[in-house]
Amino acid sequence: MHHNRDVDLALVERPSSGYVYTTGWRLATTDIDEHQQLRLDGVARYIQEVGAEHLADAQLAEVHPHWIVLRTVIDVINPIELPSDITFHRWCAALSTRWCSMRVQLQGSAGGRIETEGFWICVNKDTLTPSRLTDDCIARFGSTTENHRLKWRPWLTGPNIDGTETPFPLRRTDIDPFEHVNNTIYWHGVHEILCQIPTLTAPYRAVLEYRSPIKSGEPLTIRYEQHDDVVRMHFVVGDDVRAAALLRRL
């Protein structure tokens, strides 16, 4: 099975200085699984909301309101369980003039820790093309990293999967303001497959990369295969791979 070593890279540690945004709230009962643990799709929603708060705190919400995520990495070190309050720390791990890698750390008050990183592109909503970050944005976000020459490099580049197929019907509630399937919805599919692999437990890593948008009404299927402790997934419309995911032990 094809293996890209980038998938094994450790996420950067939280810095001791610079602009680190901190917020928190109680773990919602709507975001837990049958074991009362925070699900992956819940993690994705939470880090998206923390990102929106972070932009508002930086007074950048109106300057750079539109972002598209190309990759999300979720490292479940220890599951966060109900009841728990969650503290979120968000900071920039690397950036360039049009995109950035943003780290979010989740810490549960009753134990549990989840580390995440997202590769976000600032976009023009009308053209859906990358938009240049303001100097103020670069200065504020760049205060937590020395890497100001970030480049996009996909991790999940293996061949098409011919494994098990699982239909994944879409709903109108899955559609975002760009008229595409919201990035957090894919994590419902990842969770569906994770539950079929009972031997894959924390600590583990989940990676999701988005290749091209999925629109309402398109027939979506998940194809997946398992080799030892690694599970590969493709979200396909016909034979067109729209997103790829990977699960592996840490």
From Swiss-Prot:
GO terms for biological process: fatty acid biosynthetic process. Pfam families: Acyl-ACP_TE (PF01643), Acyl-ACP_TE_C (PF20791). Disulfide bonds: none annotated. InterPro entries: 4-hydroxybenzoyl-CoA_TE, Acyl-ACP_TE_C, Acyl-ACP_thioesterase_NHD, HotDog_dom_sf. GO terms for molecular function: fatty acyl-CoA hydrolase activity. PANTHER family: 4-HYDROXYBENZOYL-COA THIOESTERASE FAMILY MEMBER, LONG-CHAIN ACYL-COA THIOESTERASE FADM. This is Uncharacterized protein MT2057. It comes from Mycobacterium tuberculosis (strain CDC 1551 / Oshkosh). The lineage of its organism: Bacteria, Bacillati, Actinomycetota, Actinomycetes, Mycobacteriales.
